Amino acid sequence: MGEAEKFHYIYSCDLDINVQLKIGSLEGKREQKSYKAVLEDPMLKFSGLYQETCSDLYVTCQVFAEGKPLALPVRTSYKAFSTRWNWNEWLKLPVKYPDLPRNAQVALTIWDVYGPGKAVPVGGTTVSLFGKYGMFRQGMHDLKVWPNVEADGSEPTKTPGRTSSTLSEDQMSRLAKLTKAHRQGHMVKVDWLDRLTFREIEMINESEKRSSNFMYLMVEFRCVKCDDKEYGIVYYEKDGDESSPILTGFEIVKVPDPQMSMENLVESKHHKLARSLRSGPSDHGLKPNAATRDQLNIIVSYPPTKQLTYEEQDLVWKFRYYLTNQEKALTKFLKCVNWDLPQEAKQALELLGKWKPMDVEDSLELLSSHYANPTVRRYAVARLRQADDEDLLMYLLQLVQALKYENFDDIKNGLEPTKKESQGSVSESVSNSGIGSAEIDSSQIITSPLPPVSSPPPASKTKESSDGESLEQDLCTFLISRACKNSTLANYLYWYVIVECEGQDTQQRDPKTHEMYLNVMRRFSQALLKGDKSVRVMRSLLAAQQTFVDRLVHLMKAVQRESGNRKKKNERLQALLGDNEKMNLSDVELIPLPLEPQVKIRGIIPETATLFKSALMPAQLFFKTEDGGKYPVIFKHGDDLRQDQLILQIISLMDKLLRKENLDLKLTPYKVLATSTKHGFMQFIQSVPVAEVLDTEGSIQNFFRKYAPSENGPNGISAEVMDTYVKSCAGYCVITYILGVGDRHLDNLLLTKTGKLFHIDFGYILGRDPKPLPPPMKLNKEMVEGMGGTQSEQYQEFRKQCYTAFLHLRRYSNLILNLFSLMVDANIPDIALEPDKTVKKVQDKFRLDLSDEEAVHYMQSLIDESVHALFAAVVEQIHKFAQYWRK
């Protein structure tokens, strides 16, 4: 290989000198401004643009990489020009070759003087320092100048100096490449011919520049020579060829922090100073300004699950006296208190008595696990005393669960000492039983023998009366005292507590809680024994109910053990019900029905009892009522009804809240009562599954026309029935959406002849669903066609009712969230999966972050999404085929 064919190069990282750049000449004509521009800016007349000779231009040069400057700009020295701009000056840039990144580029801006101390850009151009193969540029380059702008150092640049957008520029670029190849020795050098060729190239370039509308700046990059050999500068990083390990995944680095989980002394000191007794008098008359008042109102409107920041807590504490006239602010104030500091707790409790009394429904929050202070909890109980029995009944299920957060020792200390002469003594009956079963223990508490019915001693009566009226009642004492005054409350309190007493999972997981509920039942039994004649009769009726349910469970077990098909089991069921000697269920003394104690029953009608087609075969039973009527129920054995019981209680509460707002959505909150974790009662409503309606009648409207025809009504249907159907659809769509009810299909949507649509089977709640991609609410094409289609007046009324119901329920969101917060430890299947997320799931459905107008638009989108859900329709057909093959 000849010397001329060798390529000599040096790495950029080894060339430890500054980059140099020569500014040559500027070719082309500057375009003068229009007369309009001169009139608008008279200073233009005195700028270099209007000089007779060439104006005194100068050039600035700056290196950029990735749009960021690498060094300060440098500029050419002053030079006076006459006929052409020619600086012919080398600029030493304040950056060295090893410091240049691969994508470095130099931005050149030409400036003209424009008045005192001011300059304007004549144009700018940008060129990369390294070529596409990593070679540092060398030799002369003509760069296209973009007029009236500064050079752009971003990547990609808006002012590229090397471009080939026109034919003339293509010619210049081709000649520049040939010149470069000649310089690098890729062509045979002939001196006389080279001189002629270079002269011709210069003439062509000059001609092309003059014919174009752009200006061109000629620059020269320095060549590196050593021993008369020209070296190319190749971009290279030091140690760049060394391999380095690359992590394919994330690696957790544990850094020990000796102060982790320790007290922050600064925050603690600030907290103590802010809450000290010295600040009390100064805070007493403190009133917020408008901005602070708005901030306090926002804090007060937070949902109960919202955690206050330290700044918000300090703000509420600072204006605590101002907030005492706002009942909604009390729970937020109590969240700010550090109950471990005695002085702070003392101040809070003193202020508690001066605070404007809070609403009954808001006091439920103070009974949750977040409030352990006994005085605060007793304050909540005192507020509950203002609720009537009907309202108390709506919260009773949650109040029984709230007993888990009470002081267990206080509940136990409330027990009366055992007396030998008291045949109804709970402790004696339990201790003598010798049976470890929780179910038998709890039932024995209420079914133990009664002493003769007579008036109790005056002293006992006085004590009970004083206890009942005491403002210092704990929750257990309050519930028992109210139950002793109302037989309906007593009925449900007994069954709610009895389920907690017999829960085997609770007994094994948390024996202290199990023992607490046994003590509650013992105290309840003692209170009933100490009451007057009517109260003691109440106890005997509860005992009779327990005996009746035990016999019914025994009967269902016998039927389930019976071999054969459903017909044989039906015959066995009716035979056992008719056998009064063995079961004694068809003719009993008058007792309240546990499911609905206002209804008095005399027994079960054997001939009408049937078993449903189901794996567990629940029984449909007709009870003989006191007035000779029939009361149909479903008794399920082998199924936990506590989840259905909770959902139906919430639906019943929502129905009451909506009626309070004069909105009757024709809901059907049928009654459910779990008498154990394995069995319970459900009210039977005469109705037909929507799937069966579609199979037999073809459509929902045909079903209504059959049972409620009307010539004047919409589509030949009674207007009242259609109105009921539309409202019940709207109510259940909104409610099931809020509660996240899943597994919705046309077999668990029932329809009555009066137009009421309602849901059953709440095995999946809070967003759980066995089907993939469920719609937000169950609203399919057949249901909409039952209203007359999406263009009908009834469908528009349905949407309006949905919006109204959603807005009303959002206003009661705190009450609903408080009820769910008391159920997080209730061991209900879908709540037990993620108890810490239960309340958040319900809160998210309310979309409390939206205004009322935004909430209406949100509900509109949910309805539209549900109506047009294609995948839900496919799943419905799959379910229909599955049901067909099962039959």
From Swiss-Prot:
UniProt-annotated location(s): Midbody; Late endosome; Cytoplasmic vesicle, Autophagosome
Chain positions with Phosphothreonine modification: T163
Domain PI3K/PI4K catalytic: start-end pairs: 605-871
Polar residues biased stretches: 156-170
Stretches with biased composition (Low complexity): 423-435
EC number: 2.7.1.137
Keyword Transmembrane helix: no
Any one GO CC term of the record: phagophore assembly site
GO molecular function: 1-phosphatidylinositol-3-kinase activity; ATP binding
Modification note: Ubiquitinated via 'Lys-29'- and 'Lys-48'-linked ubiquitination by UBE3C, promoting its degradation. Deubiquitination by ZRANB1/TRABID promotes its stabilization, leading to autophagosome maturation.
Keywords, alphabetical: ATP-binding, Autophagy, Cell cycle, Cell division, Cytoplasmic vesicle, Endosome, Kinase, Lipid metabolism, Manganese, Nucleotide-binding, Phosphoprotein, Transferase, Ubl conjugation
Region (Activation loop): 759-780
Annotated catalysed reactions: a 1,2-diacyl-sn-glycero-3-phospho-(1D-myo-inositol) + ATP = a 1,2-diacyl-sn-glycero-3-phospho-(1D-myo-inositol-3-phosphate) + ADP + H(+)
Keyword Transit peptide in record: no
Biological process (GO), any one: early endosome to late endosome transport
Region of interest: Catalytic loop: 740-748
Function summary: Catalytic subunit of the PI3K complex that mediates formation of phosphatidylinositol 3-phosphate; different complex forms are believed to play a role in multiple membrane trafficking pathways: PI3KC3-C1 is involved in initiation of autophagosomes and PI3KC3-C2 in maturation of autophagosomes and endocytosis. As part of PI3KC3-C1, promotes endoplasmic reticulum membrane curvature formation prior to vesicle budding. Involved in regulation of degradative endocytic trafficking and required for the abscission step in cytokinesis, probably in the context of PI3KC3-C2.
Subunit structure: Component of the PI3K (PI3KC3/PI3K-III/class III phosphatidylinositol 3-kinase) complex the core of which is composed of the catalytic subunit PIK3C3, the regulatory subunit PIK3R4 and BECN1 associating with additional regulatory/auxiliary subunits to form alternative complex forms. Alternative complex forms containing a fourth regulatory subunit in a mutually exclusive manner are: the PI3K complex I (PI3KC3-C1) containing ATG14, and the PI3K complex II (PI3KC3-C2) containing UVRAG.
Protein name as it appears in the record: Phosphatidylinositol 3-kinase catalytic subunit type 3
